[in-house]
Amino acid sequence: MAIKKNDFIEIDFVGRIKSNNAVFDLTYEELAKKEKLYDPNMKYGPRIICVGNGDLIKALDENLIGKEIGKEYKIELKNPFGDKNNSLVKILPVSKFTKERINPFPGLQINADGMLATVKSVSGGRVVLDFNHPLAGKDIIYEVKINKIVEDNLKKLKAFVENLLGEAEDHFKVEGKDNDFIINIKHDIPKALKDKFKEKAKEVMPDIKVEFVIAKGSVKE
């Protein structure tokens, strides 16, 4: 069975930098520990995605269309994050960081001026910041195992909330059956975001009806 856009599938994957085989993305907890990448705040295990809807990096997402359920693939992506842009490398005085009680060191990722940057070097009272994507200019390889297609609307909707709204599973609860569902959320979200979610959900699950409810005991923002 070939995968189509808007199909919900369960997958496992490992993403590696082609030049040195270093792992940067994965779903396997044991491998994360072995590679010293384990993060106790990260959710490991098979992931449910909606194909073609940006749940993965664009080049990988597009590459899944036409693949077969139950098979494993090695997918090479040529420079998916674009070339490095030298204008995105900035030099700042170390005093700017000490004022914010930040001790900069090479490899540290920080939010600067609303953008994610990586500290490349610290010397002579200066800090070199790189605002390029950490994988800019690199070819990568994903080893993808396509476990199964997901048909259950409840599982689809849970995955859609996590992937589209960026909400952790312990921050919401989806209830309902067949085509009618309620999403209980701990913190209210803007109406525009709710409407956008419903619109996107209707595109990929045209038969369902969704309403948001603030969980009992939560404070409406």
In which residue ranges do the predicted regions lie?
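FKBP-type peptidyl-prolyl cis-trans isomerases
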Residues: 1-221
